[in-house]
């Protein structure tokens, strides 16, 4: 029987580091923009307002509301991403078995059966939708749309080289979704962060796909490196990362952030430049460093500085009530 560790490996749980920080950014932006009318607390969590003879201060009620929402957002991120990754592994199992780079993955290696991988995918989808139900109605109603986007990605490499952008769109739902979880509304600032995520993820996925250029060509799979070659693919990746940096910078001005934000932006942009400096069309030896290390640092450090800007510089005083 497969272990929990096997399933964590199946879905590459460590790669959660890419989108999760942006979900947390979206969540805290939502706290900043939230209309702190106590009547709103009663909408998503009726039990907290309906328990008889229980007196809760407004601050405590608000803190409870946000803590529960935060946990549900994290669960949504984990379950949605796990569903998408497991489905991708299930759908690509035959290609993975033929590719020397991926033949050691859990399904082609026989560690996790096809049936178990599919069941795991369905289970994660059910848990995701269930979590959205307990957040608010708009998240619940939009949950099938989110699942469609992230599951549909696995098919795209079979017919379009724009598959990288579809992956970016899937991960870009993180900041918008987390913001919706808190506010129940859309806003420009989380959308700007989502645009940054689309371009950022698409760009580094192109870099990662450089490794499979020959295999993709041989097996009629579409990717920008397979269709356009390594050199052009890296140029497109660079352009997408330029757009990502531009969206981050524009969001900084639009949101009137201060120096903490700009420090985070400097690190984020620096990591984008770094990964393009170490990967060349003739030298792919450091693709994994560019893919995992550089982008992991970029997302985590940027999120930390954004949160410092929001909390320590009093741009979201209610966030302090949530934390303390």
Tell me what each language-model feature is.
Residues 8-9, 38, 75-77, 82-83, ...:
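Intramembrane alpha-helical segments
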Residues 23, 27, 77, 125, ...:
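Residue-level recognition of pore/gate-forming positions within transmembrane alpha-helices
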Residues 4-14, 71, 75, 79, ...:
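Residue-level signal for short hydrophobic patches within transmembrane helices
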């Amino acid at each position: 029987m497969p272990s929990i560790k096997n399933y964590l490996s199946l879905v590459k749980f460590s790669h959660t580091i890419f989108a999760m920080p942006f979900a947390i950014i979206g969540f805290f932006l939502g706290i900043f923009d939230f209309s702190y009318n106590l009547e709103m607390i009663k909408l998503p969590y009726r039990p907290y307002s309906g328990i008889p003879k229980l007196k809760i201060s407004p601050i405590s009620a608000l803190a409870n509301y946000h803590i529960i929402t935060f946990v549900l957002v994290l669960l949504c991120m984990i379950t949605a991403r796990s569903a998408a990754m497991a489905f991708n592994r299930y759908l690509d199992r035959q290609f993975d078995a033929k590719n020397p780079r991926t033949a050691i993955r859990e399904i082609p290696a026989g560690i996790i059966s096809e049936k178990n991988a599919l069941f795991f995918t369905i289970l994660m989808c059910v848990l995701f939708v269930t979590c959205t139900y307990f957040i608010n109605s708009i998240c619940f109603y939009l949950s099938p749309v989110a699942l469609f986007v992230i599951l549909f990605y696995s098919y795209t490499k079979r017919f379009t080289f724009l598959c990288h952008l579809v992956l970016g769109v899937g991960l870009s739902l993180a900041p918008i979704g987390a913001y919706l979880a808190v506010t129940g509304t859309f806003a420009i600032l989380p959308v700007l962060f989502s645009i940054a995520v689309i371009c950022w993820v698409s760009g580094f996925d192109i870099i990662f796909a450089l490794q499979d250029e020959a295999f993709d060509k041989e097996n009629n799979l579409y990717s920008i490196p397979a269709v356009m070659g390594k050199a052009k693919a890296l140029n497109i990746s660079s352009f997408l990362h330029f757009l990502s940096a531009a969206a981050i910078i524009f969001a900084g001005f639009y949101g009137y952030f201060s120096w903490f934000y700009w420090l985070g932006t400097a690190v984020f942009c620096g990591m984008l430049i770094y990964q393009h400096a170490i990967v060349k069309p003739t030298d792919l030896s450091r693709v994994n460093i560019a893919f995992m290390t550089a982008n992991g640092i970029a997302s985590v450090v940027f999120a930390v500085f954004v949160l410092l800007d929001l909390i320590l510089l009093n741009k979201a005083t209610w966030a302090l009530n949530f934390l303390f």
